Amino acid sequence: MLQQPSPPLLTNSRLHIGFMPDSEGLNRQILESYLQLREQDFLRRSHFFGGRYENLYFDRERIPAIARVLEQAESYAQNLLQQANNLRSGFWINDMGSGESTTEHDHDEDDEMLSAVYYVQAPQDSGNLVIVDSHSRTLLTPQAGMFVFFAPSVVHSVSVNRSGERRISVGMNFGPMSKQ
């Protein structure tokens, strides 16, 4: 009997998870600064779905403690991409209230090489990160202090926040440093 080759396995090994050291106090500082922002502090907003803007952009100086998160994320990104000091990054806040969700999307819009999310506040039942591919869905329960890195082409969403509290995360994209 001739043995036919097996079809390729479908895997979902596209996620890389890390944790921010000493995140509890840091997240408290980020949250306190974020809650003091006013309308005029936001540079822009994007992705208006379900009555809210999913992405809120601001100068990093408005939340000084966020610098540590961005530095740690860049270190992880340099390691994952094997690109020392050749990366630029962009970031935004996603503030998801009770009953809200984030629509299915990807980050493959420009020259991004890696995307990430960092969880500042992720109460129990505040919505799972849903990673979608053509054959499966992977649910990841967020934790405050957790980073999740993935390719920009990975389609993902966030399920409904049923916690009664806000879920606050920082989205990030990493790309090549522009040549000038």
Sequence positions of predicted segments:
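Non-heme Fe(II)/2-oxoglutarate
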Residues: 1-84
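Residue-level marker of positions within ordered structural domains that often coincide
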Residues: 35, 121, 175
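Short alpha-helical interface elements
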Residues: 55, 59, 167-173
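Residues at secondary-structure transition points
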Residues: 56-57, 122, 177
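A general structural signal for short secondary-structure boundary/capping elements
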Residues: 63-64, 159-166, 175-178
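Catalytic core of non-heme Fe(II) oxygenases with the double-stranded beta-helix
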Residues: 85-149, 153-159, 165-169
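Double-stranded beta-helix
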Residues: 132, 172-180
